[in-house]
Amino acid sequence: MAKKNASLLVKLVSSATKITSTGEEKSTGYFYVKKRNPKKLTRKLEFRKYDPVVRRHVLFKEEKLK
């Protein structure tokens, strides 16, 4: 029989920030969820994807899914 898929779910969080009305910078809070095979990919994922909060393509970096 075939082995069960060894992929993990990871969270890709936007690196974009937005200035609030009080003047402080905060993350947009937008994220994507992707599958990743830890045996093939040892480094952290980074993608340039669309962030609808800032309406631009920005860098998304991998974080652990809680």
Swiss-Prot record:
Transmembrane segments: none annotated. The keyword Ribonucleoprotein applies. The keyword Repeat does not apply. Gene3D superfamilies: Ribosomal protein L33. InterPro entries: Ribosomal_bL33 (IPR001705), Ribosomal_bL33_CS (IPR018264), Ribosomal_bL33_sf (IPR038584), Ribosomal_zn-bd (IPR011332). GO terms for molecular function: structural constituent of ribosome. Signal peptide: none annotated. One of its GO terms (biological process) is translation. It holds the Pfam family Ribosomal_L33. Keywords: Ribonucleoprotein, Ribosomal protein. Belongs to the bacterial ribosomal protein bL33 family. NCBIfam families: PRK00595.1, rpmG_bact. This is Large ribosomal subunit protein bL33. It comes from Wolbachia sp. subsp. Brugia malayi (strain TRS). The gene is rpmG.
